[in-house]
C-alpha cells in the first residue's frame, strides 16, 4: 500500500479502472533474457491501463476524462500527460482499448491481413480461437470470406468457438 500521489502543476492523477493482462507479461516475471524487460519484485506489473482522470493540473485533461495509459497495475498514478490517449466513451466501452481496439486487436489485424493475407474461400485455422487475439483473427477472416476452423482447449472453449464466434 502506498499513499495516493498528488499531481504537481502540469500533471494529472489517474485512477486505474481496467488493466490489461497479456500473454507477453509472463516473460516480464522472469530474469531470463526476453524481448520485454522483467519487472522487479515489489514493483507494479508494467502494462496498458484504462484510467479515469481524478484530478488535473494539466489543461489538456479534465476530471472525468477517460484515457489509455501505460501506468501498470496500480490503483493510482500521476502522469504529465505524455503517452496518454483520450478515449471517447460514446464510441463503445472504454475497455475495448485494451482488447479489440488495442494491442490484441492490432496484433490480430496485422498478423492476419499483413502477413497471412487470406483470400475469400480459403480456410484459416486459428489456434487459441477463444483468446483475445485468436477470436479477432477468426472474425476478420470470416469478414474476408474465409472458412474458419478454431482450435481451443477444452469442451467449454470449443463450444464457445462454435456457438459464440461461429467458427
Where are these regions (language model features)?
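Short, glycine/acidic-enriched capping/hinge loops at junctions between secondary-structure elements
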Residues: 25-29, 132
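Mid-domain Rossmann-like dinucleotide-binding core that forms the NAD(H)/NADP(H) cofactor-binding site
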Residues: 98-167
Amino acid at each position: 500500500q502506498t499513499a495516493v500521489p498528488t499531481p504537481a502543476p502540469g500533471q494529472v492523477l489517474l485512477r486505474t479502472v481496467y488493466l490489461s493482462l497479456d500473454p507477453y507479461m509472463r516473460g516480464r516475471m522472469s530474469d531470463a533474457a526476453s524481448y520485454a524487460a522483467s519487472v522487479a519484485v515489489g514493483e507494479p506489473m508494467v502494462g496498458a491501463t484504462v484510467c479515469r482522470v481524478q484530478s488535473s493540473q494539466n489543461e489538456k485533461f479534465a476530471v472525468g476524462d477517460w484515457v489509455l495509459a501505460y501506468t501498470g497495475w496500480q490503483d493510482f498514478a500521476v502522469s504529465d500527460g505524455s503517452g496518454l490517449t483520450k478515449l471517447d466513451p460514446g464510441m463503445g466501452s472504454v475497455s475495448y482499448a485494451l482488447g479489440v481496439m488495442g494491442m490484441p486487436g492490432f496484433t490480430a489485424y496485422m498478423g492476419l491481413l499483413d502477413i497471412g493475407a487470406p483470400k475469400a474461400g480459403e480456410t484459416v485455422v486459428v489456434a487459441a480461437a477463444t483468446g483475445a487475439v485468436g477470436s479477432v483473427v477468426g472474425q476478420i477472416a470470416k469478414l474476408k470470406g474465409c472458412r474458419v476452423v478454431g482450435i481451443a482447449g477444452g469442451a467449454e472453449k470449443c463450444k464457445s468457438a462454435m456457438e459464440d464466434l461461429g467458427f
